[in-house]
């Protein structure tokens, strides 16, 4: 019998035969032998089964990946829309006769300050703290993270202050003890001769307290940063939320330590208030108030705890800030002396549950509720928020808390000031080096001239420690007018290939800001068309953000010769100040704006503002006269109501100065049905007026001086300004907790 297969065994004499499957059989080893079933051909049901199996494996893989993605995605939060009660905004009425006999201690809590300022928050807190210190009515301290980049700043003089203990929970919920260090340095406040006209006392530096990393992983990696752009980055192993929560709890532990008598144990109840006010800035630091309030409730802050102030710096991003509840629980202290962890956690959650939605806790409302007084950075917007005219995303999370404080007149708007120290067309080294700085005369620039003289005084005395940033010959300006200085800036850009010869006689419109939707970038095409039709030039200078960059860069192609887009940081750093000095107009078409610092800086550089005038912009932008404009009529009525809160001399000035002599901008309504046509008209009116000014240089110079002075009127230390208002608010908060510095 023949066979297709050979079977090895005792009777096999080494016969082998290549099988039809390409292998060999036989040889006594049994290798290469196949059972008869292995040689069957696959039928259709075999292929179907394999296909079903493969499909099942793919489905399982997709399910696994999808589950992982869904687990890491933010929880969907359902917030019911609701109607809020009507509350009339009262505002802050200053008492011009108030005399404070005690210099109070103020501690600002912030993520940014001084050289470690990445955005507007750092600029605002730095300027406010400096102005408060110069007022001499407040002894100012700043508490911030110890970013490693600070070690690279020469001459800063950071010194170790003290180590402090801190408790957190480990991954198993057990108490974990760690130690963190606090360092400090002195921040020299910029000074000018006029600071000593009415008060000869020396202006002492601001003390900056640095909260360092912990001594336990991963908190020993906190606050690592090579430069200012990295201060919000987090190293691997340390979640961003853990870093924020660690900072908040460490700050509270440090403030508790500071508010004690040095002769008393750290854990003893204090009997003397060492800190009068703790001023917390922003939602990322709001939990500081929670930890401090817990210390106050336990008596750990003594019989005289500090007043707690909370400032909201915007009404969009801050409201969205939140932490995972499981992360918050990691940094909670035990509230009861019980071994029942579930009972303890229930009591802890009971305190924060009103602020929890889904698996996240939103901190803004907590900060508002726990503070003795709350501020927003714009008076007009605070009024609109309270009285229901401003609709904003996630308002349901905070508006109830805001109204509770507003009913007690403890939610007030204090409009930010403008700091003229850094970005100043009189004193900036880059402008002085090329003789592009603005001139000083009896109308403007006298204060800056005093500063320049003070800076260069050592050079006249042969002191080797003179200002080496700018040669002594470059001090001051050869220009007799602001107009001629701006023309020189245009020519400087032309000689460096950044403007054309034609641009020297065209009005220059400048946009400065982030490329994001709420900056009104949807109006760029309309603005480009209007600028081109009126013979102008548009420079768009900003940083990429959530608005499609291609939509912006395409404008260069669509409006060749009219529009230039500058989106790289280096070009902006190298040439931005020269574009500011040369610009005739600043375009600010924002849909939302808490204050509008860019617009204020534009006025300081002699640029008329073309803007939407929304939010805080409405407080200092005055539109050209237009009797048919409903907004102007509404503003006039509002001004009549608010005169009662102004000093008498300001009321008289407002009544005596007509709009024709006050306007500094051309406004349009970004929410009107004809918003684009309004913008077109605003640009047309602005350029038409500019062309008229070219034939009347003296009138043009008067107008430029008006623009500059309207910016200078927003200084932090102006009479009745932010410094005076915050001092009055601190007094209100201190009175609320039973302390009055006027009676001391």
For every predicted segment, state its role.
Residues 1:
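Short, flexible loop motifs at catalytic/binding sites
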Residues 4-9, 14-744:
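Catalytic cores of carbohydrate-active enzymes across secretory and cytosolic contexts
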């Amino acid at each position: 019998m023949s066979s297709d297969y050979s079977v090895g065994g005792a009777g096999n004499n080494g016969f082998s035969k290549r099988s039809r499957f390409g292998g060999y059989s036989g040889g006594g080893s049994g290798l290469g032998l196949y059972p008869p079933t292995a040689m069957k051909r696959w039928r259709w049901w075999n292929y179907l089964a394999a296909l079903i199996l493969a499909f099942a494996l793919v489905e399982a893989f997709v399910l696994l990946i999808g589950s992982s993605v869904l687990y890491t995605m933010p929880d969907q939060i359902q917030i019911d829309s609701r109607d809020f009660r009507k509350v009339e905004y009262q505002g802050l009425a200053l008492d011009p006769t108030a005399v404070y006999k005690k210099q109070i201690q103020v501690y600002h809590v912030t993520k940014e300050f001084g050289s470690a300022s990445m955005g507007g928050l750092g600029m605002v807190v730095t300027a406010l703290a400096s102005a408060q210190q110069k007022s001499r009515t407040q002894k100012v301290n700043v508490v911030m993270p110890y970013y490693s980049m600070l070690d690279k700043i020469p001459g800063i003089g950071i010194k170790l202050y003290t180590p402090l203990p801190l408790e957190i929970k480990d991954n198993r919920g057990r108490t974990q003890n760690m130690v963190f260090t606090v360092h400090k340095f002195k921040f020299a406040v910029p000074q000018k001769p006029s600071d000593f006209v009415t008060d000869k006392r020396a202006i002492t530096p601001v003390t900056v307290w640095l909260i360092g990393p912990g001594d336990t992983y991963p908190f020993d990696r906190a606050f690592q940063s090579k430069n200012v752009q990295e201060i919000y980055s987090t190293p691997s192993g340390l979640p961003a939320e853990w870093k924020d929560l660690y900072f908040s709890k460490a700050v509270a532990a440090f403030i508790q330590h500071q508010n004690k008598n040095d002769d008393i144990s750290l854990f003893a109840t204090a009997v003397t208030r060492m800190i009068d006010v703790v001023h917390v800035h922003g939602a990322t630091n709001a939990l500081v108030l929670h930890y401090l309030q817990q210390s106050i409730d336990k008596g750990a802050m003594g019989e005289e705890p500090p007043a707690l102030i909370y400032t909201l710096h915007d009404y969009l991003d801050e409201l969205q800030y939140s932490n995972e509840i499981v992360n918050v629980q990691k940094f909670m202290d035990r509230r009861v002396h019980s071994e029942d962890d579930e009972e303890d956690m229930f009591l802890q959650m009971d305190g924060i549950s009103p602020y929890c939605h889904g698996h996240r806790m939103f901190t803004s409302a907590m900060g508002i509720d726990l503070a003795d007084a709350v501020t927003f950075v714009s008076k007009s917007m605070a009024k609109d928020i309270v009285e229901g005219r401003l609709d904003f995303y996630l308002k349901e999370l905070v508006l109830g808390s805001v109204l509770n404080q507003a009913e007690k007149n403890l939610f007030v708007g204090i409009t930010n000031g403008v700091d003229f120290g850094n970005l100043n067309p009189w004193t900036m080294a880059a402008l002085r080096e090329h003789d592009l700085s603005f001139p000083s005369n009896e109308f403007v620039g006298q204060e800056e001239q005093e500063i320049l003289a003070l800076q260069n005084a050592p050079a006249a005395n042969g002191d080797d420690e003179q200002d080496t940033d700018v040669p002594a010959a470059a001090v001051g300006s050869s220009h007799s007018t602001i107009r001629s200085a701006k023309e020189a800036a245009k020519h400087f850009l032309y000689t460096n290939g950044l403007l054309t010869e034609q641009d020297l006689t065209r009005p220059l419109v400048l946009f400065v800001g982030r490329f994001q939707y709420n900056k009104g970038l949807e109006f760029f095409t309309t603005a480009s068309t209007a600028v081109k039709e009126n013979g102008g030039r548009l420079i768009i200078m900003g940083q990429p953000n959530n608005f499609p960059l291609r939509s912006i860069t395409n404008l260069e192609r669509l409006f060749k010769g009219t529009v230039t887009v500058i989106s790289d940081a280096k070009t902006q750093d190298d040439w931005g100040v020269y574009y500011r000095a040369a610009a005739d107009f600043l375009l600010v078409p924002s849909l939302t704006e808490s204050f509008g610092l860019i617009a204020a800086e534009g006025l300081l550089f002699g640029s008329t503002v073309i803007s939407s005038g929304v939010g805080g912009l409405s407080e200092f932008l005055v539109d050209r006269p237009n009797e048919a404009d409903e907004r102007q009529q509404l503003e006039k009525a509002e001004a009549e109501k608010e005169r009662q809160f102004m000093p008498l001399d300001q009321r008289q000035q407002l009544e005596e100065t007509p709009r024709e002599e006050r306007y500094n901008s051309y406004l349009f309504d970004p929410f009107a049905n004809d918003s684009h046509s309004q913008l077109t008209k605003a640009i047309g009116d602005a350029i038409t007026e500019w062309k008229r000014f070219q034939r009347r240089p003296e009138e043009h110079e008067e107008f430029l001086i008006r623009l500059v002075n309207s910016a200078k009127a927003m200084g932090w230390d102006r009479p009745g300004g932010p410094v005076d208002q915050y001092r009055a608010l601190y007094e209100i908060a201190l009175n609320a907790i039973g302390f009055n510095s006027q009676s001391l």
